[in-house]
Every structure is written in structure tokens, then in C-alpha cells.
């Protein structure tokens, strides 16, 4: 019965170039060591035992391979740490019927109290969506689709805003043919108003930690869900309301807990290792960056994008500004709902927020550096 369905083999992340084989037959490849991908293995599996082989290559000396905070040397040094190669996130199988939901995007509107769902569907069928809050039904929508892009809008009977430090999530059930999905969304928007960062029209001061996502035992891999949640809870207990997810694309389980807790985060890319003085550096970031935006679009806790960190001119070689501008423009084209910082801290090219990295350790001196800034 299972073999009559479409079978997808999912990988949370494999660093860096992955080739997947089923029973000795090549069935898929993926480039990029940080984002999730799936392979349709339906034609390759057989009844009974199957052998899955993954060949991973991770040459971080290649100027087009993004390594983030992974050390180029055998040992950790300065602000780079132990390397990771191969499978470092969860692997699982998904069985789907012939008519199914491939992916969805949620567009909540806090003014109208409306949720618009844009789904990519396979096959013809009826698309039905139903939302709940604290167990109470809060709205539904039903449309027929020929497949492809399917749009449905739910007028919400109750308006519960997602809040920083609190969360507040709606449960969402999606049906398409025989396919059933349980999901969630948060009712929130983001807007810049001069020097103010507004979440649901309330100015929010971001007191963030720099989370680099390394663990003593698993290096890049968290030992369990408790470890992911503990990082968030410890940070909040110390008075922080969020984090820069620094030089690493975090696994979605972490973002799930951020959504629950109301813990705001910035999504980054592990751009260290890319040589930005060459025009072809774009090939080392753009495909995987687009995959990251598409994957994490629905997380309300994710409040902004930052594809590059601390880029600058090196020696006689100037950073290729057009690459930074292109990545910024691509980001805004895919996701106009969030701000984007082109390169955090240094040589900005085109950005929504002009941020500065100041490593002054003396509080009085730090305050003096910015005493002329407008106060809100």
C-alpha cells in the first residue's frame, strides 16, 4: 500500500555537496550544507529492505563553499570552531497520496483579521483550511483547485496577536484530497517607522544574544529538543527577548520553539568562507539563501533577514558590491514582509537597517559613542 504513494526522503541538512543513492541507484543531489531538501525516491524503492547511501563532500577551502563559523584548521581557533561534514540533521521518510500539498505560505493581516494561504498543490481536488485558537474554531475556507498555486483566505472570528515574550499561535488544519496537514501561524506584522522597529504596531527594543548554534557533544547537532528549548529559556531568563542566529541556518525545531515562546530572531546565512571579491561568489550563496527564505517564511518569530556578516574590502581587493545588492533585492522580492540587512556591521551596500558592530566594552564609552542618536 505504501509503495503506491509518492515517497520523499527528507534531509534536515547535509554539509555540503550531497549525492543520494537508493539500492545503488543515484536518485538525487543537493548543494548547500545548511538547508533542508527532499528527494523523490518513489521509482527506486522496493518492498522489504532498501539501502540508502549518502555521499557528502565538504571542501571548505573552496572559495564558493560557505562554512560559517567552522574552522579551516583541524582545531578550533579564535572565533571559528570544530568542523561538521555530512548529515547533521534529522532524516525521515514522507508518504503522500497522488493529490497532496507540496508547500504553503501564510500571509496574516492584523488589521482585517484575515489569513491568506498560498499553497502549491499537486493534482485536482478540494482545498479546505480550518483554524483554531485555544481549541476554539476561528474560521475556515474551502476552494477547489486544478493543482498548482491555490489561494484561500480565512476571515478570523477572533483576533489574537502574536506577542514578543508570549507567543500566541493559531492551530491550522489543511486538507487536500487525502492529504492532511496540521500546522500553525501567528497573527503579526512588522514595519519600520523611522528609527522604530514595530511588531504589531508596537515599538520593540531588541535585546538580543548572538547564538552561534554549537554544542559540546554534537557540535552543530543539538542532542535533543530539550537542548534547543533550554537555549531559548536561559536567554529569556537573563532578560533577552531574542537572538541573532549567527553564521548558521538553524534547524526548524528551534524556530518552532521560538514561535511558541515569542522569542524573536534574525535569520542569517553562514557566508564566512565565501570570497566576495569575485562576481561568481553569488553562486555560493544565492541558491541556498533562497531555499532558506522559502523554508522559514511562515515562522512569526523570525523578524528579519541578514545574508552577510561583516564584509569588507581586503587588501587590494574590493568586495563585489553588486553581489550584496543582488542578494538584498532577491530577498525583498521573495519576502516583502520583513526587513533585510544586507551585511551586518560593516560595508553596507543596500539595506533596510544601517547597523554597526561596536566592540567597546566600557558602558560609559559605548553610551558616549551614540549620545547624538534620536531617542524614542
Pin down the residues of each PLM region.
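Accessory beta-strand-rich segments of carbohydrate-active enzymes
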Residues: 1-100, 123-126, 249-252, 261-266, ...
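Beta-strand-rich binding/interaction modules
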Residues: 22, 113-144, 150-154, 172
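Short hydrophobic beta-strand segments in globular cytosolic domains
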Residues: 27-28, 138, 204
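Signal that preferentially marks extracellular ectodomain short beta-strand elements
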Residues: 39-43, 153-166
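Short, aromatic- and glycine-rich surface loops/edge beta-strands on solvent-exposed regions
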Residues: 51-54, 166-177
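Surface beta-strand/loop "capping" patches
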Residues: 95-124
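N-terminal carbohydrate-binding accessory modules
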Residues: 104-106, 172-235, 341
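Substrate-binding/catalytic cleft of secreted carbohydrate-active enzymes
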Residues: 230-233, 242-376
